[in-house]
Amino acid sequence: MTFKAMLMLGATAVGALSVASGAQAADGKEVQMLHWWTSGGEAAALSVVKQALAKQGYSWKDVPVAGGGGGAAMTTLKAMVAAGNPPTASQILGYYALDYADAGKLADITPLAKTGDWAKVIPTALQKFTTVDGKWGAVPVNIHSVNWIWINKATMEKIGGAEPKNFDEFVALLDKAKKAGVVPLALGGQPWQEATMFDSIVASTGGVDFYKKAFIDLDESALKSGTMKKSFDNLAKLRDYVDPNYTGRDWNLATAMVIKGDALAQVMGDWAKGEFAAAHKEAGKDFLCYRFPGTDGSVLYNTDMFAFFQVSGDRQAAQTALAETTMSPEVQIGFNIIKGSAPARMDISDASFDTCGKKAIADIKAANAKGTFLGSLAQNYAQPPAVATAYYDVVTKFVHGQIKSSDEAVTQLVAAINSAK
């Protein structure tokens, strides 16, 4: 059954109807936002948008759905749209936005895009997801990249560590932490977190061209190659440096382990930096940010977008206000400083950003210019959700020992992706 067909069936489940009933706007001055930004840093960043809208006379109604990967939120959104009560807008990732556009459920905000010259300031790679057939139905709030390592500086100094320049040096650094009695690697044992880390491992092991061939092009020779096997071998090496209590841990709790010095490092997208900021920690003083060893010069990106749905006429002014406010330079700066991300607009100065933020902005511009700005498979920017889900399934089974060897993991990855395509 197609995505469009599922929506056209309507919301038949009782739970779907109960969720959808909460989406009816009280009046035309209310912005209803479905999102999964429930951690401290995320909530603080979202408040920048809320406050900017409040100055324009708009109230805000959160429809929060916890879960860092957004899977639960997308299930809720599907129910709301199917029931005929979509929110003003929803946080959304990649191919999910295209699904709603193809189903004819998104509003057309192209006039706003033309007035604001958004096509000139937003990377072309992102516009693939904000537009369909030249019509804008979503706006990017930020640009995140997943190929980062976050390190507690005091712990790093305590163990005598240095920035790892390649994968072997990273393993050696983790080994130092282990011998010092510190948890080397903070990880949450959830499929999306494990897959996010594996994105970086694949790009490091095979290089950015291999990552593109395997995950963007879905080239079967790359997927079944010795390089992919080695990538799983390297994932197994990192798994050995994770504490035994990681299963089911939320990503922000793993970040908190690094913030508190209970763990040395975390491999995570730069939304983790928002948690450091919320804890009043400073880049370079309290924590360090490095590109995952072997991925310098490339950016594996995702972008949080706000997708706008077809709503009644009295709710459209709120949509316009939200879209214009989100794309304003002031909000792009204020939001992303707190969130830990880079602005989605390429014309924003980095003057107000910390050292990690400046590096993120510079890296994105450089990668965008030389063709190494590539979508994260784990974050739904390399392939549609069905393929990403198949990827999650194989990676998490390998991490948790249900798949016993790298050879078996490669075989299952090829089969799962071929089945999902």
Residue spans of the language-model regions?
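Extracytoplasmic/periplasmic solute-binding protein
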Residues: 136-141, 171-220, 263
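Conserved N-terminal structural module of periplasmic/extracytoplasmic solute-binding proteins
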Residues: 23-98, 103, 115, 408, ...
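Extracytoplasmic/periplasmic substrate-recognition and gating elements
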Residues: 51, 159, 240, 278-342
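Short, solvent-exposed loop/beta-turn-alpha elements that line the ligand-binding surface or hinge
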Residues: 110-124, 162, 189, 205-230, ...
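C-terminal capping/gating helix-and-loop segments adjacent to ligand/active sites or protein-protein/ligand interfaces
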Residues: 140, 347, 362-417
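A structural signal for short loop-to-beta-strand junctions that line the ligand-binding cleft
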Residues: 79, 86-88, 118-151, 183-184, ...
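Glycine-centered hinge/linker elements that transmit conformational signals in sensory
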Residues: 174-176, 216-247
